[in-house]
Amino acid sequence: MTARPLSELVEPGWARALQPVAEQVARMGQFLRAEIAAGRRYLPAGPNVLRAFTYPFDEVKVLIVGQDPYPTPGHAVGLSFSVAPDVSPLPRSLANIFQEYTADLGHPPPSCGDLTPWAQRGVLLLNRVLTVRPSNPASHRGKGWEPVTECAIRALTARQQPLVAILWGRDASTLKPILAQGNCVAIESPHPSPLSASRGFFGSRPFSRANKLLAEMGADEIDWRLP
């Protein structure tokens, strides 16, 4: 992650939204460069660390919260739960998300694990922690990303525009007090991880429920279809 002003790294609306934590973002850039200098790598690749914030801030209608990036090299792409088009087999959590997507919406299974179309249509795919050390899950938790992503979520709620937050798992559910401050409705269920998907994630119908809630708030629905 290069040492550049926030306005050169993210979409203009996000640059304004994240201005209160601009110095913290810069500190995290220093942290990542120090990791590289010490011979330690991080995921996703530098240009993708802030990728979730490169899509228009004002167009976000749905928030899907992840914990931290996939630690498997080649998987993390800067959007929560998404992977590059050539990744096979899919991470188990993403495979379970697609199983629920098909059951909920009746669409055929997607051809790959790339969730970029969702990001382009107003779905913020945001991890609470934006980087991880390869093969070392949760290794960058508590290093300083949490204030950045919480600022992002507070900025979304402050817009007073319709927002549906899809919260999978206990970690994501801790965001409810922040989300309650705006025109936001939360959909909660267990995490799609193989450890918990059968305890209420399957059958939770998050995609159709999100669209129903958006319609009730007077907003356009999300086109969830993936190629």
Curated annotation (Swiss-Prot):
Keywords (A to Z) from UniProt: Cytoplasm, DNA damage, DNA repair, Hydrolase
Keyword Cytoplasm on entry: yes
Protein's gene: ung
Record-given protein name: Uracil-DNA glycosylase
Active site (record annotation): D68 (proton acceptor)
UniProt subcellular location: Cytoplasm
Cellular-component GO terms for this entry: cytoplasm
InterPro entries: UDG_fam1 (IPR002043), Ura-DNA_Glyclase_AS (IPR018085), Uracil-DNA_glycosylase-like (IPR005122), Uracil-DNA_glycosylase-like_sf (IPR036895)
Top-level enzyme category: hydrolase
BP GO annotations: base-excision repair, AP site formation via deaminated base removal
Annotated SMART domains: UDG, UreE_C
Record's catalysed reaction(s): Hydrolyzes single-stranded DNA or mismatched double-stranded DNA and polynucleotides, releasing free uracil
Protein task: Excises uracil residues from the DNA which can arise as a result of misincorporation of dUMP residues by DNA polymerase or due to deamination of cytosine.
Family statement drawn from the similarity comment of this UniProt entry: Belongs to the uracil-DNA glycosylase (UDG) superfamily. UNG family.
Predominant cellular place of this UniProt entry's protein: cytoplasm
GO MF, one annotated term: uracil DNA N-glycosylase activity
Enzyme Commission number(s) of this protein: 3.2.2.27
